[in-house]
């Protein structure tokens, strides 16, 4: 993986995430983008998900909440991708989650650790920033 590969992969992930957030795609497809195991860190503390069902559960709850708020799409407000080595990149981004009418559902800032293994690139850690 090089930096351009990581950026292209993240853009494809974001497109898929939008479809999942709207309910337009089978939520099991999230496993094409999130690694197992998965580390998620929020202001409430770190959480470690050791199997596919746990990953589907945590990401599924996030998607359900977005859908309940009328989520339609995400606008990436700022981002930076850094290649750490040939199998690992970090993507940091600030995002606006929007409804179909353009009103904002939420703003999110997060860092994604993307690792490349036998199944291709996956998000191995999702680090949600406070504030």
Language model features by range: what are they?
Residues 10-17, 34, 55, 59, ...:
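Hydrophobic alpha-helical core bundles mediating ligand binding, dimerization, or RNAP-core interactions
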Residues 97-105:
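Short, cysteine-centered beta-strand-loop-beta hairpins and adjacent loop/turn segments enriched
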Residues 76-82, 94-97, 109-116:
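Hydrophobic/aromatic beta-strand elements that line small-molecule binding cavities or substrate pockets
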Residues 1-33:
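Short, low-complexity N-terminal intrinsically disordered segments enriched in polar/charged residues
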Residues 27-81:
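A solvent-exposed, acidic/Ser-Thr-rich amphipathic alpha-helical stretch
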Residues 105-131:
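Short beta-strand edge/turn micro-motifs at domain boundaries
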Residues 85-87:
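Residue-level recognition of beta-strand termini and adjacent short loop/turns
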